[in-house]
């Protein structure tokens, strides 16, 4: 009995001591954190105003569609955080906590960029933008996503199921928006906006990979949902995402290939199922090289970062 009590004391002491310094525990999560650090960028790196000239080149239905997408994307982070809460508080591993700090930091950049693009799409008319956003956040297609998420959070029986929801939000609920924005590039429109879309979609790929890693490797104390439950959630989320696209996509636009985007959404869902050890649900083919948002590995760096100056932007004064 004395030996057993001694072991318990040693374990408690170890936990207490580890709280005071960093100890590597999650190499896969640390790898993703380092990828995020290596690919940091700022909203000030991108001259969004350069794209203002292209707003007039969109047909009215196309302009309305992209205004709608960016209104959703701008609000999405807050909607997710309000419903899923602070999942990072569940973990003691510093690798996971440090990763989430990095993710929160880049999400701030995403929010600022989306706000700038939104304003640009309204010709920098802040009043018109505010009026539009106030009405569109109540749109049926957006409300369906939010209501579905709220209902599923209420139904959640474990933290593991919340991570499935996080994987679906980051990996499915943004997919059609990212692809639709990428199609602008094929017509040489909104070059800077498309560049920001590349960066943000890559960041979200890292975030989704992190959620998959945590689900696979760091939820040992939580009951995981049955495969039938996971498939049901994936099926519902994909259907909602496809309806989201179809509800607002311009009917006669030459900019978009709606069927290709829907196929991409289904492919993304199948890929994520594979990441958590399940067979595909849709058996959707991988997008061809011509698809403007063909699947990118999160390891890929771009010349954008190689061109950035490494000099400090301010003056450092040694006042010691």
Curated annotation (Swiss-Prot):
Entry's transmembrane regions: 164-184
Any one GO molecular function term: ribonucleoside-diphosphate reductase activity, thioredoxin disulfide as acceptor
Protein name, UniProt field: Ribonucleoside-diphosphate reductase small subunit
Binding-site positions, Fe cation 1: 77, 107, 110
Membrane topology value: Single-pass membrane protein
Cofactor: Fe cation
Catalytic reaction annotation: a 2'-deoxyribonucleoside 5'-diphosphate + [thioredoxin]-disulfide + H2O = a ribonucleoside 5'-diphosphate + [thioredoxin]-dithiol
Signal peptide residues on this chain, from the entry's feature table: none
Sequence similarity: Belongs to the ribonucleoside diphosphate reductase small chain family.
Alphabetized UniProt keyword annotations: DNA replication, Host membrane, Iron, Membrane, Metal-binding, Oxidoreductase, Transmembrane, Transmembrane helix, Viral latency, Viral reactivation from latency
Function: Ribonucleoside-diphosphate reductase holoenzyme provides the precursors necessary for viral DNA synthesis. Allows virus growth in non-dividing cells, as well as reactivation from latency in infected hosts. Catalyzes the biosynthesis of deoxyribonucleotides from the corresponding ribonucleotides.
């Amino acid at each position: 009995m004395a030996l057993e009590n001694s072991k318990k004391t040693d374990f408690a002491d170890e936990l207490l001591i580890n709280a005071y310094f960093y100890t590597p525990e999650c190499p896969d999560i640390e790898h993703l954190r380092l990828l995020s650090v290596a690919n940091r960028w700022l909203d000030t790196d991108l001259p969004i105003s350069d794209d203002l000239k292209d707003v007039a080149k969109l047909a009215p239905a196309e302009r309305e569609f992209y205004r709608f997408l960016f209104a959703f994307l701008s609000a999405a982070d807050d909607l997710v955080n309000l419903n899923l809460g602070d999942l990072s508080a569940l973990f003691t591993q510093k690798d996971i906590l440090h990763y989430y700090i990095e993710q929160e930091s880049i999400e701030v950049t995403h929010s600022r960029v989306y706000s700038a693009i939104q304003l640009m799409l309204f010709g920098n008319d802040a009043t018109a933008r505010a009026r539009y956003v106030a009405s569109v956040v109540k749109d049926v297609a957006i409300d369906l996503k939010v209501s579905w998420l709220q209902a599923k959070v209420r139904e959640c029986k474990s933290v593991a199921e919340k991570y499935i929801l996080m994987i679906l939000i980051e990996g499915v609920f943004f997919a059609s928006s990212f692809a639709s924005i990428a199609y602008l590039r094929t017509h040489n429109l909104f070059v800077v906006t498309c560049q920001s879309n590349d960066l943000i979609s890559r960041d979200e790929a890292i975030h989704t990979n992190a959620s998959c890693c945590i689900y696979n490797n760091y939820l040992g104390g939580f009951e995981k949902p049955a495969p039938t439950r996971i498939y049901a959630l994936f099926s519902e989320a994909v259907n909602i995402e496809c309806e989201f696209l179809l509800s607002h996509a311009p009917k006669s636009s030459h900019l978009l290939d709606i069927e290709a985007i829907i196929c991409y959404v289904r492919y993304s869902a199948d890929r994520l199922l594979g990441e958590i050890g399940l067979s595909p649900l849709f058996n959707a083919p991988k997008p061809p090289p011509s698809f403007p948002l063909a699947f990118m590995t999160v390891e890929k760096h771009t010349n954008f970062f190689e061109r950035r100056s490494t000099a400090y932007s301010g003056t450092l004064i040694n006042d010691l």
